């Protein structure tokens, strides 16, 4: 089972003006053997606000609103879980092996958010899940369990 197989939906945030990133993302999926099934795996049109409205930048607000939009969509669709990616995703060369291990471990545990894209500290030959109780500053590759979406 690959990483995308496990999730009800996978959404990739893409600014409509960045067609180059859209093409690169499709190629990245193909390189790693991930099917690009438009019912299950699809692009989400990034929110592009005109004002920062209290966020550090317009881009930060747009990023937040895009991720929030995907979570709201997941609630409407009543998904069991969702994988969220950004259009600059570059999978590890070990994604097949580590992705399968990650999915197998998720199937046997209670989880709310699984973050796949955080730099790993320590022995990267056998990655493990770590509980995190501090902010994570990147949001390019993570999953949310449907049972916790409304709490976010």
Please describe what each predicted stretch is:
Residues 1-85, 89-152:
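An acidic/histidine-cluster motif and surrounding catalytic segment
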């Amino acid at each position: 089972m690959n990483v995308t197989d496990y999730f009800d939906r996978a959404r990739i945030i893409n600014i409509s003006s960045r067609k180059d990133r859209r093409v690169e993302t499709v190629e990245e999926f193909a390189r790693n053997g991930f099917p690009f099934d438009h019912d299950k795996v699809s692009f989400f049109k990034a929110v592009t606000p005109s004002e920062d409205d209290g966020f550090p930048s317009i881009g930060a607000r747009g990023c937040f609103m895009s991720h929030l939009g995907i979570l709201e969509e997941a609630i409407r669709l009543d998904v069991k879980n969702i994988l969220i990616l950004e259009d600059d995703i570059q999978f590890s060369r070990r994604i097949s092996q580590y992705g399968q291990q990650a999915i197998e471990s998720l199937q046997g545990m209670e989880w709310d958010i699984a973050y796949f894209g955080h730099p790993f500290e320590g022995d990267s030959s056998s990655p493990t899940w770590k509980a995190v109780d501090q902010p994570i500053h990147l949001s390019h590759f993570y999953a949310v369990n449907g049972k916790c979406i409304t709490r976010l």
